[in-house]
């Protein structure tokens, strides 16, 4: 799975891994996984972090090696890519005219009528929170942040 990483990513992740390999034995404590991920700019939920720790620490010794970490990062990037594709497809549903943004009225209608519907006040609060640049529309980056609860950069 590490094959899904670019050579640059592999080099970067190996370097960061080595920073946490305090004893120089090729192992990092699973307790350090959150700090390691945070340094990369990934902030998983506690549940995701527990699952990741379980994935990299198969022998339950409380440590993981660089290969396991690279496999984990490959899986993470693959999931991120899949999520991005799903979000792009959803965004296109709302951006029917391919303007690159979603009108407030369109989004408000969807938020109030689809899935677990929000009331008008909740929908407006969510949209105001999502509209980071205050232009009255939701662009793709704002849409992703709203849907995932995370900030998103197109450079990822």
Curated annotation (Swiss-Prot):
Summary of the tissues where the protein is detected: Expressed by the venom gland.
Gene3D superfamilies from the UniProt entry: EF-hand (1.10.238.10)
Database matches in SUPFAM superfamilies: EF-hand (SSF47473)
Keyword terms: Calcium, Cytoplasm, Metal-binding, Repeat
Pfam families: EF-hand_7, EF-hand_8
Record-annotated EF-hand domain positions: 8-43, 44-79, 82-117, 118-153
Keyword Nucleotide-binding: no
Highest taxon in the source lineage: Eukaryota
Classification via SMART domains: EFh (SM00054)
Gene Ontology CC annotations of this record: cytoplasm; myosin II complex
Record-listed Ca(2+) binding positions: 131, 133, 135, 137, 142
InterPro entries per the UniProt record, alphabetical: CALM/Myosin/TropC-like, EF-hand-dom_pair, EF_Hand_1_Ca_BS, EF_hand_dom
Cell compartment(s), UniProt: Cytoplasm
GO molecular function: calcium ion binding
Keyword Repeat annotated: yes
Transmembrane parts of this sequence: none
Family per record: Belongs to the calmodulin family. Calglandulin subfamily.
Function (record text): May be involved in the cellular control mechanism of the secretion of toxins from the gland into the venom.
Protein name as annotated: Calglandulin
Source organism of this protein record: Pseudonaja textilis
């Amino acid at each position: 799975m590490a094959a899904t990483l670019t050579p640059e990513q592999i080099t970067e992740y190996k370097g960061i891994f080595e920073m946490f390999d305090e004893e120089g034995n090729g192992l990092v404590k699973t307790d350090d996984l959150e700090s390691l991920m945070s340094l990369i700019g990934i902030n998983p939920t506690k549940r995701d972090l527990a699952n990741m720790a379980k994935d990299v620490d198969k022998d339950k010794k409380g440590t993981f090696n660089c290969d396991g970490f690279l496999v984990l990062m490959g899986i993470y990037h693959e999931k991120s890519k899949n999520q991005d594709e799903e979000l792009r497809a959803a965004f296109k549903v709302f951006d029917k005219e391919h303007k690159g943004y979603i009108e407030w009225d369109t989004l408000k209608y969807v938020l109030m009528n689809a899935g677990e519907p929000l009331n008008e006040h909740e929908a407006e609060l969510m949209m105001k929170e999502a509209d980071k640049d205050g232009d009255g529309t939701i662009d793709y980056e704002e849409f992703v942040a709203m849907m995932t609860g995370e900030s998103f950069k197109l450079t990822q």
